């Protein structure tokens, strides 16, 4: 960081601290309690006078400061919360009195003292000693307004977390959602595993991959676009229930619902089909909602989402008929469906095949009507190259998407385990991509087909978008609000505090 960005007044104080032989950046300090523990301890023992003089050690960042002659009050914050520190010069040694003069908002300090309440009843620590732990050299965002520039909030998330309690709570909730999901999966007998991020083939989804080069092996690798194919290899290998919570990378557009790097939870269960997985997902999500919120509802914008089981189930064909007035099987080719969409004044991308056009109809006409959690089922084969066909209608697959708040939060199907049919689907998919000249991954994973050829039991697979799920739990309508460091276009003028 160029020195001109540093605050001159803070730099002067830093030099004064150093001149007194104090290291402004010591290597350690051992608090005896967190702020939350100190407040709880005060409540517990404040009627027992003999314990109130117990010496505690707290540490945190100075968030506010009020000086009144020989008395000062500071609020410090650690990871558990806030604690008021009461400084009276008569109670401090000379070194602490001098250090107090050079402390600013944003500095990290360690304090020793005993618990007390002020005349207004505020839990406080009456300090007898203060230690410098880290000198802040840049001013914090203004207290009452925080960080107002939305893009800067994302670029400098550390400042957002310092100044915005809602941002801190969002990521605490995110962590808890993932922990509760993990506990649920473990309790159901699923084995958590880790699969490669760097892969020789980009498979498991229709998406454009990121490509990188391995110098030692002198070959290209893809950043994974899905967890699916390696997890199904583990089902082949004899694990009946597996799951992974991991990062996915897709070299595609950015929006309020899409980030190039995002988190998925995928699970695979032997001897299950998509209806079993539907019941499982319904139980999992409603259980997580109840564990975190205490009930089955969540506020989202100006509506209330109700996750009480069972959720409505609607076939994709019926949904498109109902909301778009189109039976997509009446337009069985890309050309006829594109013509119908053009007639309805919808923009048609010539690079998209029939399945992608159907998906656009769903996004344009169906999803805006699906606010409460709903299962959209029975997708066409053209949209689902890894899913089993429905025996009663081979044009459709045993697949569902869970839609909530007008966006997909999960996708699942009865996994295709016929290696001959899977190879045929892959080849058809590859031919379509070649004709359309798309930038999506264009290779057949021969090792995955070999694994299927050894035999995979009937399997139900599930993918849950963790980021979108967290959006629902935290009442955010942008995925950037729930990802600590979302992808942004580089901009030099925001790399440092202005």
From Swiss-Prot:
Its cofactor is Mg(2+). Its main location: cytoplasm. One of its GO terms (molecular function) is tRNA binding. Mg(2+) 1 binds at residues 401, 408. GO terms for cellular component: cytosol. Mg(2+) 2 binds at residue 408. It is found in: Cytoplasm. Transmembrane segments: none annotated. It catalyses: tRNA(Lys) + L-lysine + ATP = L-lysyl-tRNA(Lys) + AMP + diphosphate. PANTHER family: LYSINE--TRNA LIGASE, CHLOROPLASTIC_MITOCHONDRIAL, LYSYL-TRNA SYNTHETASE. HAMAP family: Lys_tRNA_synth_class2. Homodimer. This is Lysine--tRNA ligase. It comes from Dehalococcoides mccartyi (strain ATCC BAA-2100 / JCM 16839 / KCTC 5957 / BAV1). The gene is lysS.
């Amino acid at each position: 960081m160029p020195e001109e960005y540093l605050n001159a007044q803070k730099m002067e104080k830093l030099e004064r601290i150093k001149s007194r032989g104090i290291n402004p950046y010591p290597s350690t300090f051992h608090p005896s309690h967190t702020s939350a523990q100190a407040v709880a301890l005060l409540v517990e023992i404040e009627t027992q006078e003999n314990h109130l003089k117990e010496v505690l050690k707290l540490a945190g960042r100075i968030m506010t400061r009020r000086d009144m002659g020989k008395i000062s009050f500071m609020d410090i914050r650690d990871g558990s919360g806030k604690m008021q520190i009461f400084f009276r010069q008569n109670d401090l040694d000379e070194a602490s009195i001098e250090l107090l003069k050079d402390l600013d908002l944003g500095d990290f300090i360690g304090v020793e003292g005993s618990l007390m309440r002020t005349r207004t009843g505020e839990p406080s620590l009456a300090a007898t000693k203060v230690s410098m732990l880290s000198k802040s050299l840049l001013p914090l965002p203004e207290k009452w307004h925080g960080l107002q520039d939305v893009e800067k909030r994302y670029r400098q998330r550390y400042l957002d977390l310092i100044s915005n309690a809602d941002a801190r709570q969002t990521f605490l909730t995110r962590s808890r959602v993932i922990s509760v999901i993990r506990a649920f999966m473990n309790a159901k007998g699923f084995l958590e595993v880790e699969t490669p991020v760097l892969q020789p083939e980009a498979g498991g989804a229709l998406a454009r991959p990121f490509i990188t080069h391995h110098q030692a092996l002198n070959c290209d690798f893809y950043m994974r676009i899905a967890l699916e194919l390696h997890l199904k290899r583990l089902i082949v290998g004899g694990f009946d229930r597996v799951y992974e919570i991991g990062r996915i990378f897709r070299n595609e557009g950015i929006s309020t619902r899409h980030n190039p790097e995002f988190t998925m939870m995928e699970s695979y269960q032997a001897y299950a089909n998509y209806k079993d997985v539907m019941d499982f997902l319904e139980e999992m999500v409603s259980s997580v909602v109840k564990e975190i919120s205490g009930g089955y509802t969540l506020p989202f914008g100006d509506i209330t989402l109700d996750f009480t089981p069972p959720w409505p189930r609607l076939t994709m064909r019926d949904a498109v008929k109902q909301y778009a007035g189109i039976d997509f099987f009446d337009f069985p080719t890309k050309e006829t469906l594109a013509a119908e969409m053009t007639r309805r004044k919808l923009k048609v991308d010539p690079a998209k095949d029939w399945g992608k056009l159907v998906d656009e109809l769903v996004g344009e006409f169906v999803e805006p009507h699906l606010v409460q959690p709903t299962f959209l089922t029975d997708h066409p084969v053209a949209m689902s190259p890894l899913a089993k066909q429905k025996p009663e209608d081979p044009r459709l697959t045993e697949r569902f998407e869970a839609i909530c708040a007008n966006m997909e939060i999960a996708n699942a199907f009865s996994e295709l385990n016929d290696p001959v049919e899977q190879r045929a689907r892959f080849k058809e998919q590859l031919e379509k991509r070649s004709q359309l000249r798309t930038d999506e991954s264009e290779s057949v994973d021969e090792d995955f087909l070999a694994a299927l050829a050894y035999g995979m039991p009937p399997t139900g697979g599930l993918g849950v978008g963790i980021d979108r799920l967290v959006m629902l739990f935290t009442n955010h309508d942008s995925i950037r609000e729930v990802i600590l460091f979302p992808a942004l276009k580089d901009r030099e003028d925001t790399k440092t505090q202005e």
